[in-house]
C-alpha cells in the first residue's frame, strides 16, 4: 500500500507578484526550488497564512536569486502581494519499504 507523505515544505514564502492573465501555476525562484528539491511542473499545495485559502497547482522556475514567488492565472485570486504562504509537495511511498524525511526550507529564517 502506498501512502502520501510530505516531501518538501517551503515556509513563509511571501507573494511578490501576481499574474492573473497567465496560464496558471506558481513561479518560485529557481534557487529556492533547488533548496526545496522541487522540480519543474511538480504538483504543489499552497496554503495562504493570511486568508486560509488552499489550492493545488504546479511549479515553474523564476529567475535565480530574485526571491520571486508569483501566483499565476486563477491562483492569483487566492492571495495578495505580501501574503505569506506555505508551499508543500508530497510523495507516494510504501511505508513498509522506505521512510522519507521531508526537506524543510524556512524563508522567515533565511534558511
Curated annotation (Swiss-Prot):
Keywords for this entry?
A: Autocatalytic cleavage, Cytoplasm, Decarboxylase, Lyase, Pantothenate biosynthesis, Pyruvate, Schiff base, Zymogen
List of residues that carry Pyruvic acid (Ser): 25
InterPro entries of this UniProt entry?
Asp_de-COase-like_dom_sf, Asp_decarbox
State any GO BP term from the record: alanine biosynthetic process
EC code(s) of this entry: 4.1.1.11
Q: Does the keyword Lyase apply?
A: yes
Its assembly, as annotated, is: Heterooctamer of four alpha and four beta subunits.
Protein name, per record: Aspartate 1-decarboxylase
Q: Which organism is it from?
A: Coxiella burnetii (strain RSA 493 / Nine Mile phase I)
Tell me the name of the encoding gene. Answer: panD
Amino acid at each position: 500500500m502506498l501512502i502520501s507523505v510530505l516531501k518538501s515544505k517551503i515556509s513563509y514564502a511571501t507573494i511578490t507578484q501576481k499574474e492573473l492573465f497567465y496560464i496558471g501555476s506558481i513561479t518560485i525562484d529557481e534557487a529556492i526550488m533547488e533548496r526545496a528539491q522541487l522540480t519543474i511542473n511538480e504538483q504543489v499545495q499552497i496554503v495562504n497564512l493570511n486568508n486560509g485559502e488552499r489550492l493545488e497547482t504546479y511549479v515553474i522556475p523564476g529567475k535565480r536569486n530574485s526571491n520571486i514567488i508569483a501566483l499565476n492565472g486563477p491562483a492569483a485570486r487566492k492571495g495578495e502581494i505580501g501574503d505569506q504562504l506555505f508551499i508543500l509537495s508530497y510523495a507516494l511511498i510504501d511505508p513498509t519499504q522506505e521512510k522519507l524525511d521531508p526537506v524543510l526550507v524556512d524563508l522567515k529564517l533565511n534558511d
